[in-house]
């Protein structure tokens, strides 16, 4: 007969890897078409002019230019401003 009761096993001890979300291009940074500007879950930051919105709510550049973040009516918006050619 066993002199000790069987020890229970822990049911915790696992964790998922981070999803690498967040802002990928800062305000004023140069982008080309297709560059990812923000990776997010839901539209925390809304798309503005010259940016597209992917099915996973990723915001990406549609034109060459500089990134611009602004707030309008409590909504964060990201635009890409075209660089004036000399």
Curated annotation (Swiss-Prot):
Keyword Ribonucleoprotein: yes
Superkingdom, taxonomy of origin: Bacteria
Keywords on record: Ribonucleoprotein, Ribosomal protein
Keyword Ribosomal protein belongs to the record: yes
GO biological process, one term: translation
GO cellular component, one term: ribosome
Region of interest called Disordered, as start-end residue ranges on this chain: 1-24
InterPro entries attached to this UniProt entry: Ribosomal_bL27, Ribosomal_bL27_CS
GO molecular function, one term: structural constituent of ribosome
Family note: Belongs to the bacterial ribosomal protein bL27 family.
Name under which the protein is recorded: Large ribosomal subunit protein bL27
């Amino acid at each position: 007969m066993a002199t000790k009761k069987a020890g229970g096993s822990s049911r915790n001890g696992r964790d998922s890897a981070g999803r690498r979300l967040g802002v990928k291009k800062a305000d004023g940074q140069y982008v080309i078409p297709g560059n990812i500007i923000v990776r997010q879950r839901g539209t925390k930051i809304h798309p503005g002019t010259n940016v597209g919105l992917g099915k996973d709510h990723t915001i990406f550049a549609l034109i060459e230019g500089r990134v611009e973040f602004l707030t309008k009516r409590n909504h964060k918006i990201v635009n890409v401003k075209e660089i004036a050619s000399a």
